[in-house]
Amino acid sequence: MGGYILGGGHSPLSSLYGLAADQVLSAEVVTPDGRFVTADFTQNTDLFWALRGGGGSTFGVVTSITVKAHPDLPVTASTFSFTVGGNNGSITSENFWTAVRNYLDYFPSLSSQGIYAYWFIIPTATGPMFLMQPFWAPGKTLEETNALLAPWFAQLTALNITFTPKTVHYDSFYPGWLASFPLEAVEKTHVATGSRLFPKENWESPESLNATFEAIKTSSQANLTIIAFIIDPSLKNGGYPDNSANPAWRNTYAHVLQSINWAQGASAAVQLQARQNFTFGFMQRWRDVSQGAGSYLGESDILEPDFQQSFYGTFYDRLLKIKKQLDPKDVFFAQTAVGSESWKVVTANGLPSGDGRLCRV
């Protein structure tokens, strides 16, 4: 849980309660000089601020964290999918993408209701598949959840897209989460992933939302996998925390990832070319339509240019100052962590990796 909380941390309750970092009340830490300290709102306050969102492997070894406890609540979850070529070939590519574009229109209203939607666009043999797994409605009844989905479902029906949603109400959070969310795999060695926190301004005009949609569509049509969330961990939802979580989190309706893969066992040259195309091609398109926004460092591209702005935003200068004060000898290091620009990892094959020699820049 350390890296999850220290890096910000999003969850199925983020549109209600904010980020994981927003829940922290105190932390016990071993500092780089070997002291065991408590950091909270009254002592070691700079360290406490930095730990809540400024990234792991940077400021100390966190041995324990005290967090807020929220009351259990009921939840309704819905899962469904539709695929180009489905319904005996009746779902056309044009209608599929119209459906996805329509879906984006609902992000502001859904997030205002505390919704956290976990959705995918996955390449298949017949064309892309849209998968919702799940549409997560904490505190909502079955009827309320169906009402939230009804406008978009009506549009899907009008587009001749048939689907069979499985919508289930649970009296408690944990059984709902256990039944609704997929088993996650660790990152694979033949996959590169990057993310973008698309800003709320992108929903302020049809032109900007269309540009966002086209950037996502372009990646999907190149057979990249899209993994995304409706999410709104705003300052209001997080209880107006004063912490170091990326400010881009406070101004988004959508955390969207894309991933590219190459053949297992591919040469270093092939892998490097794929990564370059991904970082400076597909990811650059996303940056171009969300200038000044950011990326979630916990689900990010290791080659992200200007990672200081993307992962930490306007908080980077303060974080770097705290890093230099607490860890002047750079006892702690992680790639793309605060202060890591003073170092580089030199690998034998030139691939970006933490497996190599750590050298001063």
PLM segments and residue spans:
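Soluble FAD-dependent oxygen oxidases
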Residues: 1-361
